[in-house]
């Protein structure tokens, strides 16, 4: 072997050694806790933001319910304008989740957790939209005498707020058992929706003067029923987070 070959071999060995050292540095135990700490911090920030948004949504439902019962048009307007805040919160947290996934490269349970929170945000935003839609019907119903006190609409709204509060509590506790109970509560909203629909249609048939108010009531009841369905979707997300099972 020539002196030139020896020099080349030495150079290659040095390069290989440098690459090995660099790889070992990247795999040192200190790097893992640092990444874990950053991911934990981001997950904590995201979860807090989701819960804050959930509180806004729950408040919107309760305010829509009060506006419905008291014919409070000003309160209904606040629910409608407040929906923009909920929408912006959803967009902000979605961006944060995307950045966290891109920069932290979460896997397994962490990735499932972030994707679950992203879908929870989507469902909460839609619930906020439904609360706003109920408030818009309140603006049209408020000037007129209530049609049989709107049948079950106030109770449906209150039950919807209870469901949202319940799924947020289950999310905080990561509690699949509590999440599964939400579906049972949603059945009650479904029952009230069908009873309201049937009774309002009967009132509309009995007196054509009830048609416009009755139509508004049916529209509002539809949105309230959807609130229950979306709360159930969040509950199913929590079950998936805990068990990995899709229900």
Question: Model-derived features: where do they sit?
Answer:
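Cytosolic, long alpha-helical scaffolding segments
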Residues: 1-247
């Amino acid at each position: 072997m020539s002196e030139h070959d020896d020099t080349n071999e030495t150079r290659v060995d040095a390069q290989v050694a440098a690459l090995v050292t660099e790889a070992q540095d990247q795999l040192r135990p200190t790097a893992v806790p640092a990444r874990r700490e950053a991911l934990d911090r981001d997950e904590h920030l995201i979860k807090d933001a989701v819960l804050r948004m959930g509180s806004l949504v729950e408040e919107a439902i309760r305010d829509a319910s009060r506006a419905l019962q008291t014919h409070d048009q000003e309160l209904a307007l606040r629910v409608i304008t407040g929906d923009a805040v909920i929408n912006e919160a959803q967009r902000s947290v979605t961006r944060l989740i995307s950045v966290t996934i891109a920069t932290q490269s979460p896997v397994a349970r962490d990735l499932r957790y972030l994707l679950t929170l992203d879908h929870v945000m989507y469902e909460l935003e839609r619930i906020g939209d439904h609360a706003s839609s109920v408030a818009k019907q309140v603006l049209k119903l408020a000037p007129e005498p209530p049609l049989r006190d709107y049948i079950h609409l106030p109770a449906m709204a209150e039950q919807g707020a209870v469901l949202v509060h319940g799924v947020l509590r289950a999310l905080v506790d990561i509690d699949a058992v509590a999440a599964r109970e939400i579906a049972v509560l949603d059945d009650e909203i479904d029952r009230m929706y069908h009873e309201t629909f049937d009774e309002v249609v009967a009132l509309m048939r009995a007196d054509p003067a009830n048609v416009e108010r009755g139509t508004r009531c049916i529209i509002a009841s539809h949105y309230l029923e959807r609130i229950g369905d979306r709360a159930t979707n969040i509950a199913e997300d929590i079950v998936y987070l805990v068990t990995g099972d899709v229900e």
